[in-house]
C-alpha cells in the first residue's frame, strides 16, 4: 500500500497552472527541504499526529470572545490591560481569512505559486494599520509571558506570524510590524481538576520582519522544479529531521532483513 496521499495532485515541473501551498508548507520547507520535496512532488507526506482538540476549542472561544467586542468596535479588556491602542478589525472577508482551507491568499507571480494561510485574528490600530494576532494555549508550571530566544523552536511561531503579515501586505493592506500573541497557560498549581482548567492569559508583542518570505518562496519553487531529492533538514526541536532519520534507519534495517532472508 502506498503512503502517498491524494488530497491534491503532485507538482509537475514546468506546470502552468498555479500550485497551491499553505503557510504550513513554508514551515515544512524551512525545517526540512527533503520532507517538503517528497510532499509536493510525490505526495509522500509525514505521518500525521492526533489533533490538539483542547487547543482548537480555546482558539474558538477566543474568537467568539473577541468577536463580541468586534461587533461593538470596542477594545477587548486584554487590549486595555496591555495598553494596546487598537480594536478587533471588522472586514467582510474575516471569516474566510480565518478558515483553514481558504485563509488569506495571494498568487506569487514570479513563481506561479498560490500561497495561503489562516490567521487567528486581526486587529486595527489608531493609524489604520492591521495587526496580526495569534492565539496560543499550553499548560506549564509558569505562564508563558514571552517567546523563547531566537534559535529556539519558538521561531516557528515567529515565522507563522510573519507569513500572515506578508500575506496581508500582498493584498494591499497597511500592516503593522508589531503583532501580538494571546497566550493562555493552563494552571498546574491547583489542588485538583474539579471538572475545569483555569488559565492565565498574557498578551505580548512580536516585532516581525517578513523580508525572508519572498526569497524562501523562490527557493521553494527551485526545490519543486528539481528532480533531485534535497538533503535532510532539521527537527522542530533541533537536531536532524526525525522523520528522515526514522525512514533511513527503518529502510536500512529492512534491507538487512531482506538480505538475510535471501541467504537463508
Which residue ranges define each predicted feature?
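Serine-centered coil/turn micro-motif
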Residues: 49, 76, 155, 240-244
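Metal-dependent nuclease catalytic cores that hydrolyze phosphodiester bonds in DNA/RNA
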Residues: 1-129
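Metal-dependent nuclease catalytic regions and adjoining charged, substrate-binding loops involved
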Residues: 1-4, 11-14, 20-21, 167-264
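Short catalytic/ligand-binding loop motif for oxyanion handling, primarily in non-cytosolic enzymes
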Residues: 37-38, 45-47, 140-143, 187-191, ...
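Mg2+/Mn2+-dependent nuclease catalytic core
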Residues: 97-215
Amino acid at each position: 500500500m502506498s503512503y502517498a496521499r491524494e488530497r491534491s495532485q503532485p507538482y509537475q515541473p514546468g506546470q502552468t497552472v498555479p500550485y497551491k501551498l499553505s503557510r504550513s508548507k513554508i514551515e515544512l520547507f524551512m525545517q526540512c527541504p527533503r520532507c517538503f520535496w517528497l510532499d509536493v512532488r510525490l505526495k509522500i507526506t509525514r505521518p500525521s499526529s492526533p489533533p490538539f482538540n483542547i487547543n482548537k476549542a480555546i482558539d474558538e472561544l477566543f474568537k467568539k470572545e473577541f468577536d463580541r467586542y468586534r461587533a461593538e468596535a470596542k477594545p477587548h479588556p486584554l487590549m486595555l490591560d496591555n495598553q494596546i491602542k487598537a480594536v478587533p478589525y471588522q472586514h467582510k472577508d474575516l471569516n474566510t481569512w480565518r478558515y483553514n482551507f481558504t485563509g488569506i491568499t495571494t498568487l506569487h507571480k514570479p513563481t506561479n505559486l498560490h500561497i495561503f494561510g489562516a490567521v487567528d485574528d486581526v486587529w486595527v490600530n489608531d493609524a489604520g494599520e492591521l495587526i496580526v494576532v495569534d492565539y496560543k494555549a499550553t499548560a506549564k508550571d509558569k505562564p508563558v509571558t514571552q517567546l523563547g530566544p531566537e534559535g529556539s523552536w519558538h521561531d516557528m511561531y515567529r515565522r507563522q506570524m510573519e507569513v500572515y503579515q506578508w500575506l496581508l501586505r500582498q493584498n494591499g493592506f497597511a500592516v503593522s510590524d508589531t503583532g501580538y500573541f494571546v497566550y493562555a497557560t493552563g494552571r498546574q498549581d491547583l489542588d485538583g481538576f474539579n471538572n475545569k482548567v483555569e488559565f492565565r492569559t498574557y498578551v505580548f508583542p512580536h516585532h516581525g520582519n517578513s523580508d525572508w518570505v519572498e526569497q524562501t518562496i523562490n527557493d521553494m519553487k527551485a526545490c519543486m522544479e528539481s528532480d533531485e531529492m534535497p538533503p535532510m533538514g532539521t527537527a522542530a526541536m533541533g537536531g536532524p529531521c526525525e522523520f528522515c532519520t526514522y525512514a533511513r534507519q527503518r529502510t536500512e534495517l529492512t534491507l538487512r532483513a531482506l538480505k538475510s532472508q535471501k541467504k537463508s
